[in-house]
Amino acid sequence: MRTYDPTDVSLRRNPYGLLAELRETEPVHWCPPLDAWLLTRYDDVKQAMTAPQLSSDRLRPFYESLKDERRDILSGVMRYLNEWLVFKAPPDHTRLRRMMNPVISPRLVQSMRPSVRAIVDDLLAGVSRDQPFDFVHDVAALLPAYVIMDMLGLARADFDKIKGWSDGLRLFIGTARGVPDKYQRARDGADHLAAYLREQIEQRRRAPTDDVITRMMQAEDEQGKLGEDELIAMCLLILFGGHETTTSLLGSSVAALLAHPSQWTLLRDTPELMPSAVEEFLRYDGPSHSIARVVTESMTWDGQHIKAGDRVFAMVGAANRDPRAFDRPDELDITRSPNRHLTFGQGIHFCLGAPLARLEAQVCIQAMVSGFDRWALDGSEDQAIDWLDAMVMRGPTRLQMRLENTSQT
């Protein structure tokens, strides 16, 4: 039987055939290239998201297993990543989530719809009407970056340097394979981002403003306010989680519609389907490809003995295509209901930024569908689309397309 090898370029393009094979023949699969277990069935992945024997603090055991030289390189990265909500367990997670929920609330997100639409309109106005363009570079990477930077009160002019630093950090967080200097690049990215954010925090100490950084600085519970490292870590999480994952969602959504023109037509003719369509994009080829956990106590899962200390990857992409949970799982159906995809997680680690990601996708895709008569890839799918080299994230890094016979409305 084939195993899952994240260095296999063909799996970057389309991992779903192999994942389906594993799901049907060995749903709890030992993966030698990753030295980890893979879970591929919907019920197993859903259970893994909340199972008490599976810890979300998977970075610390990995870090401690490294050689001294690599630990020294990554110490500056771990200083902040150890404070991320996604790697925390109660009671620390409970405290941080309680403080963050009112800062990034659904009401705040909905109030941002006009500004999100203005950013989308501005980006699409700059897209070439007679030449191919890279949707990821020209739209999908910029929209969530500008939205998040506006929320945090950061200057959009700083985008290029923030993106460069974030790309370095992504090599570590996204579990990129085959990048020899990824730890040093992650360290450099984290160091630069932390220094930049420390300066932003100091500016707001001198002159508070009405932005998310200021509101996080003012948030307080019975244990007091967030410490400076916690503030920097929270800003990093918002920047990274709110930017990288939404970029991937936008790119994958456009790729899915380009591959399914009948669904594009249906969405154009029935715009009220947009919320349902975004949920289907999240299910069909969502940005969360897997979540990693560490086993805290030995267990047996579907006949397989899993030892304490083992790593487990719950393959969200495989679960979202499980025929036990979804009819016609390999078909894109923007009318699908119900749609209980697992892309945003479950339980205490349900994605804090889910409402914002949904809003950005709805506004952007609606503007593209209603504003242009026809889309087309610039060449074959293999020629036009490059995919992330990552284990836990999925999405295009390049998507060359054309807007043909376009007319602005």
Where are these regions (language model features)?
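Cytochrome P450
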Residues: M1-T409
